[in-house]
C-alpha cells in the first residue's frame, strides 16, 4: 500500500473534517506504540513540532534578520551584511542586534503551529478527496495546495507580531520592546496597524511555503531514489535526519528567491505607517526589491534546513509515524501494465 493510500485511510478518522469517512490506518504507518496517524493527538504533536521548529530558528537568527531588514529599508546607510552589523553595533551597541526577539519568538511560534499543523491536516484531507491514484499522480499539486492553505491561516497568526518586530527593528523612534511598541501601534493605528501588512505577507509567505513544502517533499523523494544508496526503511534515524537537513537547505534556497520581493515590501510597509504596497513597489523598481537577497538566501537556507531537521526530530522524539516517500499504488501499476 502506498503512502497516499495510508494517508487516505488515516484521514477517514480525521476529526477536523466531517466529510472524511471512518477507517483504520495501515500498520506500516502507525506501528505498535506509535501515536495513531491522522488522529487529533497526531496533529497536535505536529503543531507542537511546528511551534518549536519555527519559534526557535527564527529567534536564533534575529541579528541577521535585523540587518537584513535594515538593508531593505535603508540601503544607502546599510550597504551590506558586514556594514550593517558594524553600523548597528557602533551606533546602538551589541544589544541592539537582538531587538525584536520577543515578537519574533511569539509570532513565528504561532505561525509554525499553523504552518506545519494545518499542512498535515490539509495534505491528508486533500489526498482523501483525490483518491489513492490521483493523490500519487498529482502529489506535487497536492503539496502545493496543502501548504498554501496552511500558510493562509498561519499568516493571520503571524501578522501582528511581524508588524511589531519590523517597527522595533527599523524605526528609530519606536519603543525597543514588545510591551512598548505593540501598544504604540494600537494607539496610533488601531488593529489596522497590525494587519495592514497581511496582504503582502501572504504574497511573501504563501509562495515561500508552497516552495518550502513541495520542494522539500520532492527533494526527499529524489535523494532516496538517486543519491542515498539504500532504501529509507534501511536507513537509521540519524541518516534519515541528515537527508531531511539536506533537502531542507535545498528547499530554503528556492524559498528565499521566490519570496524576496514581497519580503522587501513587507519590511518597508511596516516601517512607514503611511506607506502602501503599490507606492513602495513603484518607488523601489525591479532592482530595489531584490536588495538584501544574499543575506536572505543564507538566512532562509539555514533556517529552512534547521526547521525541517527540528520538526522531523520532534516526530522521532514523540514517536510519531513518519511515512516514507510515496510509491505508485498497486492499482495504478496494474493499469499501466495493462496498457503496455
Curated annotation (Swiss-Prot):
It comes from the Eukaryota. The keyword Transit peptide applies. Keywords: Membrane, Mitochondrion, Mitochondrion inner membrane, Repeat, Transit peptide, Transmembrane, Transmembrane helix, Transport. GO terms for molecular function: phosphate transmembrane transporter activity. Solcar repeats lie at residues 41-125, 138-222, 239-317. It is found in: Mitochondrion inner membrane. GO terms for biological process: mitochondrial phosphate ion transmembrane transport; phosphate ion transmembrane transport. It holds the Pfam family Mito_carr. GO terms for cellular component: mitochondrial inner membrane. SUPFAM superfamilies: Mitochondrial carrier (SSF103506). The chain crosses the membrane at residues 47-67, 95-114, 141-161, 200-220, 241-261, 297-317. The keyword Nucleotide-binding does not apply. Residues 1-27 form a transit peptide. It is a multi-pass membrane protein. InterPro entries: Mitochondrial_sb/sol_carrier, Mt_carrier_dom_sf, SLC25A3/Pic2/Mir1-like. PANTHER family: SOLUTE CARRIER FAMILY 25 (MITOCHONDRIAL CARRIER PHOSPHATE CARRIER), MEMBER 3, LIKE-RELATED-RELATED (PTHR45671), SOLUTE CARRIER FAMILY 25 MEMBER 3 (PTHR45671:SF10). Belongs to the mitochondrial carrier (TC 2.A.29) family. Transport of phosphate groups from the cytosol to the mitochondrial matrix. This is Phosphate carrier protein, mitochondrial.
Amino acid at each position: 500500500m502506498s503512502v497516499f493510500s495510508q494517508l487516505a485511510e488515516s484521514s477517514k478518522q480525521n476529526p477536523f473534517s466531517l466529510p472524511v469517512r471512518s477507517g483504520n490506518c495501515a500498520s506500516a504507518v502507525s506501528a505498535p506504540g506509535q501515536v495513531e496517524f491522522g488522529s487529533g493527538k497526531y496533529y497536535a504533536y505536529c503543531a507542537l513540532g511546528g511551534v518549536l521548529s519555527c519559534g526557535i530558528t527564527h529567534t536564533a537568527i534575529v541579528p541577521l534578520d535585523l540587518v537584513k531588514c535594515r538593508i531593505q529599508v535603508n540601503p544607502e546607510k546599510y550597504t551590506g551584511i558586514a556594514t550593517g552589523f558594524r553600523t548597528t553595533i557602533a551606533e546602538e551597541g551589541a544589544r541592539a542586534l537582538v531587538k525584536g526577539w520577543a515578537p519574533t519568538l511569539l509570532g513565528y511560534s504561532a505561525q509554525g503551529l499553523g504552518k506545519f499543523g494545518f499542512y498535515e491536516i490539509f495534505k491528508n484531507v486533500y489526498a482523501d478527496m483525490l483518491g489513492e491514484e490521483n493523490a500519487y499522480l498529482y502529489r506535487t499539486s497536492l503539496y502545493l495546495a496543502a501548504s498554501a492553505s496552511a500558510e493562509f491561516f498561519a499568516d493571520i497568526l503571524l501578522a501582528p507580531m511581524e508588524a511589531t518586530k519590523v517597527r522595533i527593528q527599523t524605526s528609530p523612534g519606536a519603543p525597543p520592546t514588545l510591551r512598548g511598541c505593540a501598544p504604540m501601534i494600537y494607539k496610533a493605528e488601531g488593529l489596522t496597524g497590525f494587519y495592514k501588512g497581511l496582504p503582502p505577507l501572504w504574497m511573501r509567505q504563501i509562495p515561500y511555503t508552497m516552495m518550502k513544502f513541495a520542494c522539500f517533499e520532492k527533494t526527499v523523494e529524489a535523494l532516496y531514489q538517486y543519491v542515498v544508496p539504500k532504501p529509507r526503511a534501511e536507513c537509521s534515524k540519524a541518516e534519515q535526519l541528515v537527508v531531511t537537513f539536506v533537502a531542507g537547505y535545498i528547499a530554503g534556497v528556492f524559498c528565499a528567491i521566490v519570496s524576496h520581493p514581497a519580503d522587501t515590501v513587507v519590511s518597508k510597509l511596516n516601517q512607514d505607517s503611511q506607506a502602501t504596497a503599490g507606492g513602495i513597489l513603484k518607488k523601489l523598481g525591479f532592482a530595489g526589491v531584490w536588495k538584501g537577497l544574499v543575506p536572505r538566501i543564507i538566512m532562509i537556507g539555514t533556517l529552512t534546513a534547521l526547521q525541517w531537521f527540528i520538526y522531523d526530530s520532534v516526530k522521532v522524539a514523540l514517536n510519531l509515524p513518519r511515512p516514507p516517500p510515496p510509491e505508485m499504488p498497486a492499482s495504478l501499476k496494474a493499469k499501466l501494465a495493462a496498457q503496455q
